[in-house]
Regions:
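Generic short N-terminal amphipathic or hydrophobic helices
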Residues: 10-13, 157, 187
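Histidine-anchored nucleotide/phosphate-binding helix
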Residues: 66-67, 173-181
Length: 218
């Protein structure tokens, strides 16, 4: 099992690779806190395609502006991407939701043009696409840990994680719970103005559930 990545675990490696001589130098190097954005499934099929959503259509431009501003402010950006294969209807999810969507390589699988255009104008320090075959990206915490290690950082260096995207009541809440299980002491914020549920009612129900599970709703 992967050990919990703490500042204490990292210090010997940082000393080795940076040439720092004293523990105090390492602590000073890692003072800057990291804010991570997890942008969930902002793909055409969830906005104007197979699972078109009027609420997503109404706020995708705002979401893209927020993502761009956060990237320019130095946030680490992780984008989940729902990714299915041609046999989607034969899967468990497909049997319960028999609407083909986000089939890899199709137009609906692509990110929304508003998000693509916004991110084309920025160069985040970290920009990572996480493809996933189901609601929650189980590999997302591992990808975050890998980036922390690559930057000689620790979980303790995360100020907060901000989660937003589509749909609030399915993939947003699923990925928020994955992150909460992996990072129990990290503040996780849900940007409700950058989310949309299958319906306005299910959006609110998901936010209520997230609030009950100690996520910060803004």
């Amino acid at each position: 099992a992967r050990p919990m990545l703490t500042a204490a675990l990292y210090i010997p490696r940082i000393l080795q690779y940076t040439g720092c001589k004293r523990r105090e130098e390492v602590v000073a190097m890692s003072d800057k806190k990291i804010i991570i954005d997890v942008v969930v499934d902002v793909q055409k099929d969830f906005i104007t395609g197979a699972l078109a959503n009027e609420q997503a259509q109404a706020n995708v431009a705002h979401l893209a502006k927020v993502a761009k501003a956060h990237a320019e402010a130095g946030h680490w950006m992780f984008f989940t991407r729902d990714t299915h294969e041609d046999n989607y209807l034969d899967t468990r999810e497909g049997r319960h939701l028999p609407v083909e969507h986000c089939i890899e390589g199709t137009d609906g699988w692509n990110f929304a043009p508003e998000l693509e255009d916004a991110m084309d104008d920025t160069e985040p320090e970290v920009s990572h696409i996480v493809c996933k075959k189901t609601f929650g990206a189980y590999m997302l915490p591992s990808d975050i840990l890998d980036e922390l290690m690559a930057h000689n950082k620790a979980v303790d260096d995360i100020e907060k994680i901000i989660v937003y995207g589509y749909c609030t009541d399915i993939c947003v809440i699923s990925n928020a719970m994955v992150l909460r299980a992996a990072f129990p002491e990290v503040e996780i914020e849900i940007r409700s103005d950058c989310c949309a549920g299958v319906t306005p009612q299910s959006h609110q129900t998901a936010l209520d559930a997230l609030r009950a599970c100690q996520f910060t709703i803004v």
